[in-house]
Amino acid sequence: MANQRIRIRLKAFDHRLIDQSAQEIVDTAKRTGAQVTGPIPLPTRKERFTVLVSPHVNKDARDQYEIRTHKRLVDIVEPTDKTVDALMKLDLAAGVDVQISLG
């Protein structure tokens, strides 16, 4: 696979889970002889929700919730055929969203 690059974007709500998955990808790629850049932490998206506690009165009583979406980027610069096969067989955690693009 000459002059190719595999870009892997990871998304998860738990930062420990995404770091563990990124490390598994990097270790697998390096073990098969590919050159790896990353994992690069991308900005964390914070969604905040405000909910009224009382169903009728007391507008001052509110709860605030937050969902954080952590993102990482891993570039595999010179993948080999072994690298692609090893990445296909890799079993990552269920809470991690993986997007792969070839460039």
Swiss-Prot record:
The keyword Ribosomal protein applies. GO terms for molecular function: structural constituent of ribosome; tRNA binding. Keywords: Ribonucleoprotein, Ribosomal protein. It comes from the Bacteria. One of its GO terms (cellular component) is ribosome. GO terms for biological process: translation. The keyword S-adenosyl-L-methionine does not apply. Part of the 30S ribosomal subunit. Involved in the binding of tRNA to the ribosomes. Belongs to the universal ribosomal protein uS10 family. This is Small ribosomal subunit protein uS10. It comes from Alcanivorax borkumensis (strain ATCC 700651 / DSM 11573 / NCIMB 13689 / SK2).
